[in-house]
Amino acid sequence: MCAVAIHRSDVVMPSVLLTGGRTAKGKKRASRRRVKVPKLPKGARRKRASVTPVPTVATATASERAALTNLARRLQRGDYAAWRPADYTSPAVSEAARAAASSGTPATARDLATGTLARAVPMTGTGGRRRKRTATRRRSLKGGFLPALIPIIAAAIGAIPGIAGTAVGIANLKEQQRQFNKIYGDKK
């Protein structure tokens, strides 16, 4: 139900229901009759909790929610051992490529842990020549890159209604951003 107030220059009187008392003449008494008003059903009488809609940029699918929940649990447990990057390749592939490049002949390598077999054929040349690249010095993060991911994941979880309350998610996000900036902020 929505109530709209319209402000005008003239005064509007409210509607009045007379249930008893004197009439305009003041001599006669109004009959004491009870006016029966139909009762509202019990469900309508109960005061509903006010619902505030929270706009979301994009809602996550059930699979995305499950993945984020799983990720959050693993972060809480500290289970980082089984993590692999999205572009993960078997060690057999890199070993076969390295052997083929250095020998100049086709090479095969097998990963005994997973059973992955990789074959590599050199494109051109005899191999053996390798250029040394000067490594650019990168600033190392305290505790590796995983602590840096925690606020991002927490923000993602906080942004999805159903996993965490939105207000709680926002409060946690602000605190985590503050801690993150305190540790990794611009230091010169």
Curated annotation (Swiss-Prot):
Residues 1-128, 145-188 form a propeptide. One of its GO terms (cellular component) is viral nucleocapsid. Keywords: DNA-binding, Late protein, Virion. The record marks 14-15, 144-145 as: Cleavage. It holds the Pfam family Adeno_PX. Residues 22-52 are annotated as: Disordered. GO terms for molecular function: DNA binding. It is found in: Virion. Residues 24-49 have a biased composition (Basic residues). It comes from the Viruses. InterPro entries: Adenovirus_late_L2_mu_core (IPR008393). The role of the precursor might be to condense the viral prochromatin for encapsidation by virtue of the two basic domains. Belongs to the adenoviridae pX family. This is Late L2 mu core protein. It comes from Fowl adenovirus A serotype 1 (strain CELO / Phelps) (FAdV-1).
